[in-house]
Amino acid sequence: DKLLFFIYDPHGIPQLTEFVNRWQVLAQDNGLPPFYFIGNVTRSIEQEKGNALDAYALDLKNKAFNIEKNTVLRKGLSYLFPFPINVIRYSKAIDKMVDDILFRKSKIYPIIYPNWDHSPRAGNSASIMHGSTPQLWGKLLEKVISLIHDKDEGDQIIFIKSWNEWGEGNYLEPDLKYGRGYLDVMNKMLRKENVYNERGKW
């Protein structure tokens, strides 16, 4: 067994190899298992090969919004219009957030979103996934689970991004509109795949 160490911005660490090696030494010196380093990736996986990380979590949200393209134009338009312009229907976003080839590969883990709207923080420059529902969330889960189904058991990992501190409209918790809808759908999908142990826990 290893300790999971997730790095949100590997490129923000100038000496990544030294950083990883240092933490492995600290783990060994303190009688801990080695770390398993996973780096968050939003662009090409090919650019990451050869670095010190063990695996990658692939986040394709930017691809769904085409954020890498026309960035300057988008920023300029956000100042001109009194409303967010970077809006995509969740039903379309869930297709763009999935890579049928890469998500099947070993040591590449999907990152998926139940919803996204950080307009309370970003205002008119916000990115918004509009029209998310528990049913569409279930469709995304089912698709991604099917892609990792044939991986080795220890490699069947999905990261669900639900961090409403930074993206206020990015959450799984019960709300007034859908109640426990998102959690119930996820529970249903996981039980369907028999990912719970005999005690009913993850």
Name each model feature, range by range.
Residues 132-177, 193-200:
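Substrate-binding cleft of secreted/luminal carbohydrate-active enzymes
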Residues 13-35, 170-189:
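Surface-exposed flexible segments
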Residues 30, 96-108, 147-154, 189-196:
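A structural motif corresponding to the C-terminal end of an alpha-helix
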Residues 1-13, 156-165:
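Active-site groove signature of glycoside hydrolases
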Residues 182-202:
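Carbohydrate-binding surfaces of carbohydrate-active enzymes
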Residues 19, 93-97, 137-147, 182:
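Alpha-helical packing segments of well-folded alpha/beta enzyme cores
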Residues 15-134:
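Aromatic-lined glycan-binding groove of carbohydrate-active enzymes
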